[in-house]
């Protein structure tokens, strides 16, 4: 029996030529802008892309010309396929906004007996999990795939996943006095109007911070404070807050450890925004300590976690 696991994520430019494609596809996603009229959404996406293209390209250039998400995901896939090498199970991936898209990946497995879709987002949101699954399901329909389809949903409450987070946090401050450091969980912000329509993202993120905080306390790890802040605001609408820049500007300790709680794989928002852009704010405020914890990425712990989740269903 041929079984396939497709890891789903947002994607990111693999080179500077893909920056425009990434922006255009992201802003043309009906789950992002919330505009149902395709023509209006397309025009607005084009305008936003043109306005942001130069600065986004400059940001990617600082990252070496590409987002890290592609290379890390491919490494993760390779490690998973090696781990399951003796079983009739194949791992692959699909991105929402850059190649390989869902239809590109799924066409390779049109005759698989079973396909497991695994969105790599710990919290539920229409802008992430729903959008990725919608793209995959549209591809499945277009390709007339008759395979048995299974889905792994959000997993922020999973203790195995959260132990990866707490372990990476503890490792980062192993030689530090954590009681003098403020731990800030940074989450990708969303417009409040999306939350007001019933999106679970804010609730799940708040609950996740509480779960991790309790686990750290149980392990005897004490921080000066633990808080949640948001990043990546865009445009004049009202967004979830507080903004990370405001939190950093008002931080009296001048010592901050940042954990990107929205992401399983590092990308431009972690490697550029958190590690470069917000670090500049910390430098301007003369911080004594500012560090960003890496996402689970292609670590052996995350490989083992994905294997555990997959074995539950296949």
From Swiss-Prot:
InterPro entries: Ferrochelatase, Ferrochelatase_AS, Ferrochelatase_C, Ferrochelatase_N. Fe cation binds at residues 188, 269. It comes from the Bacteria. GO terms for biological process: heme biosynthetic process. Pathway: Porphyrin-containing compound metabolism; protoheme biosynthesis; protoheme from protoporphyrin-IX: step 1/1. CDD domains: Ferrochelatase_C, Ferrochelatase_N. It is an enzyme of class 4 (lyase). It is found in: Cytoplasm. GO terms for molecular function: ferrochelatase activity; metal ion binding. Its EC number is 4.98.1.1. Keywords: Cytoplasm, Heme biosynthesis, Iron, Lyase, Metal-binding, Porphyrin biosynthesis. One of its GO terms (cellular component) is cytoplasm. It catalyses: heme b + 2 H(+) = protoporphyrin IX + Fe(2+). Pfam families: Ferrochelatase (PF00762). SUPFAM superfamilies: Chelatase. Catalyzes the ferrous insertion into protoporphyrin IX. Belongs to the ferrochelatase family. This is Ferrochelatase. The gene is hemH.
